[in-house]
Design a protein with these regions (language model features):
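Catalytic helix-loop patch of NAD(P)-dependent Rossmann-fold dehydrogenases
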Residues: 14, 23-65
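Glycine-rich Rossmann NAD(P)(H)-binding loop
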Residues: 93-98, 123-130, 182
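NAD(P)-cofactor binding segment of oxidoreductase domains
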Residues: 1-16
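NAD(P)-dependent short-chain dehydrogenase/reductase
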Residues: 53-99, 105-106, 112
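Mid/C-terminal beta-alpha module of Rossmann-like enzyme folds, strongest
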Residues: 110, 117-164, 190
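Conserved C-terminal active-site "lid" loop/helix of NAD(P)H-dependent oxidoreductases
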Residues: 132-138, 156-202
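Short aromatic/basic micro-patch
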Residues: 64, 101, 130, 152, ...
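Helix C-cap/helix->beta junction micro-motif
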Residues: 10-11, 58, 144
Length: 203
């Protein structure tokens, strides 16, 4: 991010930097807004936050876009659950981690909207609404016509069953506050975005 920011400034280009909810501790009780102070608890989160600061320091015309629970092309949660359902009659999925599933297509649309403007700064961009991983899995299976049972477990229970699993933030809900405050653009509801994604995969 540092070198990109310097290069963008030297040639007068705009810079779009995509960041993450991991810059926050994940212990919130209300949706995080852009004015909330980051407090990353993982190496990944700290790295992303440092990247944001480099952009703010060295770039003149920038859009920092934080998103969460992203899925699209390549490996992602939706495809992982569909794959697991092929070999499992039941799955154990946490229900005490909450966030807003966000389609990469919807994120790209938002960036495409922002990029031609001079509305620079920091933005949160997640699909509207929120859920937990277990309920999200059930919505995926419902759309795919899959009958694999989803057992709801706590993060603590899941960690005991899968000691090597990475720790994730308990609370990942980002409020698209600046987007709503400064533009008339609205992200799609996560259910609708998931419908489109699943249909594109043939479900």
């Amino acid at each position: 991010p540092r070198n990109l920011s310097i290069a963008a400034t030297e040639v007068g280009a705009k810079l779009v930097h995509v960041s993450t909810d991991y810059v926050f501790a994940g212990d919130g009780t209300r949706p995080y807004v852009e004015y909330d102070t980051p407090a990353p608890i993982s190496a990944y989160g700290r790295s992303k936050y440092e990247g944001e600061k480099f952009v703010q320091q060295f770039a003149n015309r920038y859009f920092i876009v934080r998103t969460a629970w992203l899925y699209g092309d390549g490996k992602n949660f939706v495809k992982t659950m569909l794959k697991l359902s092929e070999t499992h009659d039941e799955l154990f999925v946490v229900d005490d981690q909450v966030g807003s599933p966000t389609s990469a297509v919807e994120l790209a649309k938002m960036i495409h909207f922002l990029e031609p403007t001079e509305n620079y700064g920091l933005f949160h961009a997640t699909c509207e609404g929120d859920t937990n991983w277990a309920d999200f899995t059930e919505e995926i299976f419902k759309r795919a016509g899959i009958r694999t049972k989803v057992n709801h477990v706590t993060s603590e229970e899941y960690a005991r069953m899968n000691p090597a699993s990475a720790k994730r933030p308990a609370y990942s809900i980002l409020e698209d506050f600046m987007l709503k405050l400064t533009t008339d653009y609205r992200m799609a509801d996560w259910h609708d975005a998931l419908d489109v994604y699943m249909k594109e995969m043939g479900y």
